[in-house]
Regions:
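Gram-negative outer-membrane beta-barrel transporters
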Residues: 29, 142-150, 166-252, 290, ...
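Residues on the lipid-exposed face of transmembrane beta-strands in outer-membrane beta-barrel proteins
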Residues: 19-25, 77-81, 129-133, 175-181, ...
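Extracellular loop and loop/strand-boundary signature of outer-membrane beta-barrel proteins
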Residues: 3-10, 22, 56-66, 111-118, ...
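Membrane-embedded beta-barrel scaffold of Gram-negative outer-membrane proteins
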Residues: 82-100, 118-173, 178-182, 194, ...
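Transmembrane beta-strands of outer-membrane beta-barrel proteins
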Residues: 33-37, 75, 89-91, 140-143, ...
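C-terminal beta-signal and adjacent terminal beta-strands/loops
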Residues: 189, 232, 241-250, 274-324
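Signature of Gram-negative outer-membrane beta-barrel scaffolds
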Residues: 1-84, 205-208
């Protein structure tokens, strides 16, 4: 409970069981097929409770509790082909199931009986296609495209000062790429990139509304170089870049809604070094090597002056370990 007696959300008791079967087989030496099934049993007991009020003076809404029972079968299937090391394609399909943020839904209820509240679970259909490549054991590449659709969404939105679950249909799609190379026996380098986008179906039936920055992060690029000058030592330099996400306009008051603030670009360098001497391990890590000043993505997307906070500056950590 809060200090003045209001409950943040009702006290929930959940009992979950999920038997599953997962199989994998190889056909004709090169074709890999996997298949799985899962059955979820979820029983949530909800006591009688009061809806969370924005102010103590707001009228009290009493909700009669009860039990919420969920039963669901979900499947997954995947196929990959690895006869040619330089090009190994794969496709996959899976179903997801969750009772996402049930507490938020219940605490913001507008009905006085549990059975009248929309507590339907989130079910997703997930698709992925991609390929992996191994070129002479010195260069590994991978790339994939994914798409997820849900008839009932799980994005969050602000309503009367509280976060509530947006049940509008949603779709999320994106790409993931990675590359790793052994340039010399003691020198490696690599990079990875990820980009996501998510949209909601508006009342007009069009996919013209972006999901909030809480659910969809900005694009991210990571790069590294790892060098071992002598045996049992290493030096690694990392570069991390997060992109800009600016999908929303200020509201009528000229400010951004929470979760819709502009997320600006961030560039960081991190340095790590280590050496092993017999049973001793010594490592040095310097995060934010250039002491770059920036706000955390959480501060930027929330767009509330009171919660803007700088991220950590340069941070040096020395670790000593002994094995026996």
């Amino acid at each position: 409970p809060l200090v003045e007696g209001r409950y943040w959300m009702p006290w929930l008791t959940s009992n979950n069981h999920a038997p599953f079967l997962q199989t994998k087989t190889t056909l004709w030496q090169w074709l890999n097929v996997k298949f799985g099934a899962r059955y979820d049993f979820i029983n949530v007991r909800v006591p009688n409770y009061d809806v969370l009020r924005n102010k103590v003076t707001d009228p009290v809404v009493h909700v009669a509790g009860g039990s919420l029972r969920y039963n669901n079968v979900s499947f997954n299937v995947g196929v990959s082909y690895n006869k040619v090391a330089a090009f190994q394609p794969f496709v996959a399909y899976s179903q997801g199931f969750s009772i996402f943020d049930l507490g938020r839904t219940l605490r913001a209820a507008k009905a006085d009986v549990l059975s009248k509240i929309s507590t339907a679970p989130v079910k997703t259909n997930n698709y992925e296609i991609g390929a992996y490549s191994d070129i002479n054991h010195w260069l590994q590449l991978s790339g994939s495209f994914f798409y997820t659709y849900s008839k009932l969404g799980s994005d969050l939105k602000i309503e009367n000062g509280f976060w509530v679950v947006n049940r509008t249909p949603q779709k999320v799609y994106g790409v993931e790429l990675s590359a790793d190379a052994r340039i010399l026996p003691n020198l490696k380098a690599g990079a990875n990139f990820s980009w996501f986008e998510g949209k909601l179906k508006s009342s007009t039936g069009k996919w013209d509304t972006y999901m909030s920055n809480i659910s969809i992060p900005a694009a991210k690029l990571g790069m590294y170089v790892n060098y071992s000058p002598i045996e049992n030592t290493y030096l690694q330099l990392q570069y991390v870049h997060t992109g800009k996400r600016n999908r929303f306009a200020p509201n009528a008051s000229g400010v951004y809604n929470e979760g819709e603030g502009i997320v600006r670009r961030i560039n960081l360098l991190n340095l790590m070094a280590g050496v092993k001497v017999k049973s001793w391990d010594f490592s040095l890590a310097v995060s934010n090597l250039l002491n770059y000043t920036y706000y955390t993505p959480a501060s930027m997307l929330m767009a509330r002056n009171a919660e803007y906070a700088h991220a950590d500056g340069r941070n040096i950590t020395l670790t000593v370990g002994f094995r026996y």
